[in-house]
């Protein structure tokens, strides 16, 4: 089992300094071009136009909201605590390049300040249903295009807050109606440098076939599936299956970021301090290595680096990213 203490001991000051220097250079570099036929979010082939910007959809992660629809087709999925109340309930943000091909996504819920800063990294159009008044300064600071509420209501026998979904074609229609561009308006290059990476020779490599993330509300876990070479997503004690086709939700890459937060009020609203630098883990192929992460501005890309300060090479495929509160980081475990 790997602990936060062991990781911090392994990360040298000069590794952090080197990574920060490289990261600042990358964030300030000129916009790169998307590559035709390649999904810049996964490094895999796509039929979507290379210039098509993604959508980021806020998805409820309360047990009552299950099953999730369209989650298995997301290119990148973020999970973070949505509130310090309700046993630190989490919420998901799923990012899709080829969103027109997904039958149904959701159910849709409100956004939080952190989601706005992260969605802005992708120049995505954020789909949500409202949010606390704390979100408005972040929309102003990022200039993020977003669509709030008014999506399809699908009767499922649940309370109204669990019935809103984005169905195929709806995102494109709403984007056009709002006058937003479907093409990138700002593209700072790929989040990840894709390439084959076994991690076998990396510093601090450890076995990671069974992973526990300290989100107490839903007990997020990942189990490495050697036959698919991906990590199967578990919560509430069961494998997460897509409500559309019952496919197990899984990811080639799993990132864990140690990230503290600021409590905004007594109602549990918060914002992660995701602009800065800290430690984390990268998991793929049943192994894990310690990394550092860096984000320098509201809209700047979060970049990941190995302990020697080199930009991390990430295996092509779908990616899950958890922002783990620093006060719980010591409870991250894998074996």
Where are these regions (language model features)?
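A surface/extracellular/periplasmic glyco- and lipid-processing/surface-interacting theme
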Residues: 35-78, 83-335
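Sec-dependent signal peptide cleavage junction
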Residues: 22-38
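N-terminal secretory signal peptides that target proteins for export/translocation
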Residues: 1-5
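Sec-dependent N-terminal signal peptides
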Residues: 7-24
